[in-house]
Amino acid sequence: MVVELQILGRAVKAAQYRQHRALDSRLASIGSTLAQWDALRAIGRTPGASARQLAAATFQSEQAFGTLAGRLVVQGLVDRQPGHGRRIEHHLTPEGQRVLTAGHGVAESVLAECFEGLAETEREALLGLLRKIEGRPEDEAGP
């Protein structure tokens, strides 16, 4: 069977879209959005990171991340502190850590539902294939 690449690409995008919609909808129950929770997750993984690093980690432009981070500061979820030179470091506040932790619970539930139709071996194979096309080693840990 020959697989059309555009159909394959669309199938990957459709699965991602379904997952993102479910996450965004359920994260609302803890007062967050997927974009906000993803930013908190990136800051939690790399406390003190710059906006440039966090923008790359969350697949956003620096400008978009800066706007989002500003909203997170106003909400009391993130603290910005001067770093080396002109660098601004980002840290979670205790409330930001609480929302991040609650979001992990939501994400585990949503992702369990999204992947429930796959056996563990199929999940491992899917992860390996996605990492292969991403150019990452299969055994590399990451988000």
Regions found by a protein language model. Name each.
Residues 51-52, 63, 88:
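Residues within helix-turn-helix
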Residues 30-36, 64, 93, 116-120:
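Short helix-coil-helix linker/hinge
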Residues 1-30, 77, 92, 98, ...:
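N-terminal leader segment of winged-helix/HTH proteins
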